[in-house]
Amino acid sequence: MKRLLIVLIALLAMLEYRLWFGDKSLAESFHLQEQIKLQQQSNAQLVARNQILREEISDLRSGTEALEERARNELGMVKEGETFFRVVGGERDKPSND
């Protein structure tokens, strides 16, 4: 009976060790769950970014307005007959917090 008790205690100690410190332990499980949450957040951001890019591609394919806007903003191009004005100066007037 004494040997059986010793064997059972040793088995319990071995199982507890594996639970807390071994492969697939609770600590590793919590760490993996945290990594999954971070990856899901990253995936959600990338899905939103992809949707924006898809919409932009669709706009560029379907009409000239988006293409013209992009040419104006990124390349500084102007239409024939338009006058380009560049405002040079410091920061815009900001309301004071007083």
From Swiss-Prot:
It comes from Shewanella halifaxensis (strain HAW-EB4). InterPro entries: Cell_div_FtsB, FtsL/DivIC. Disulfide bonds: none annotated. GO terms for cellular component: cell division site; cell septum; plasma membrane. Signal peptide: none annotated. Essential cell division protein. May link together the upstream cell division proteins, which are predominantly cytoplasmic, with the downstream cell division proteins, which are predominantly periplasmic. This is Cell division protein FtsB. Part of a complex composed of FtsB, FtsL and FtsQ. The chain crosses the membrane at residues 4-21.
